[in-house]
From Swiss-Prot:
Belongs to the universal ribosomal protein uS15 family. The keyword rRNA-binding applies. One of the primary rRNA binding proteins, it binds directly to 16S rRNA where it helps nucleate assembly of the platform of the 30S subunit by binding and bridging several RNA helices of the 16S rRNA. This is Small ribosomal subunit protein uS15. Residues 11-22 have a biased composition (Polar residues). PROSITE patterns: RIBOSOMAL_S15. InterPro entries: Ribosomal_uS15, Ribosomal_uS15_bac-type, uS15_NS1_RNA-bd_sf. Residues 1-10 have a biased composition (Basic and acidic residues). Residues 1-22 are annotated as: Disordered. Part of the 30S ribosomal subunit. Forms a bridge to the 50S subunit in the 70S ribosome, contacting the 23S rRNA. NCBIfam families: S15_bact. One of its GO terms (cellular component) is cytosolic small ribosomal subunit. The gene is rpsO. Keywords: Ribonucleoprotein, Ribosomal protein, RNA-binding, rRNA-binding.
Length: 89
C-alpha cells in the first residue's frame, strides 16, 4: 500500500527542513508513520494477512532506528517530531 503522490508531497512539505529537503530523518519518519497507520487499519480488517504483518514489523523497526538516530543527534528535533506526529517515543 504505497502512499499516493498528493499525500506524500503534503508530508514532505510539512516536515522538510529546507526547500529541497525530501530525505531528512523527519520526512522519512513521517512517511513511515503514515504507511504504518494505513497498514494497521488494513490488518484490523484482515487478521490473517501475515505477509503484511511482517512488513509492518519491518517498518516499525526502521522507524524506531531512525528515531533513535534523531534522538542521539538532536533531542529538540526528536521531541518536536514526536509531538507533531503524535507517536510514543
Amino acid at each position: 500500500m504505497p502512499l499516493n503522490t498528493e499525500k506524500k508531497q503534503e508530508l514532505i512539505n510539512s516536515h522538510q527542513t529546507h526547500a529541497t529537503d525530501t530525505g531528512s530523518v523527519e520526512v522519512q519518519v513521517a512517511m513511515l508513520s503514515e504507511r504504518i497507520t494505513q497498514l494497521t487499519g488494513h490488518l484490523q480488517s484482515n487478521k490473517h494477512d501475515y505477509s503484511s504483518r511482517q512488513g509492518l514489523m519491518k517498518m516499525l523497526g526502521r522507524r524506531k532506528s531512525l528515531l533513535g538516530y534523531l534522538k542521539s543527534q538532536s533531542s529538540e528535533r526528536y521531541d518536536t517530531l514526536i509531538q507533531k506526529l503524535g507517536i510514543r517515543g
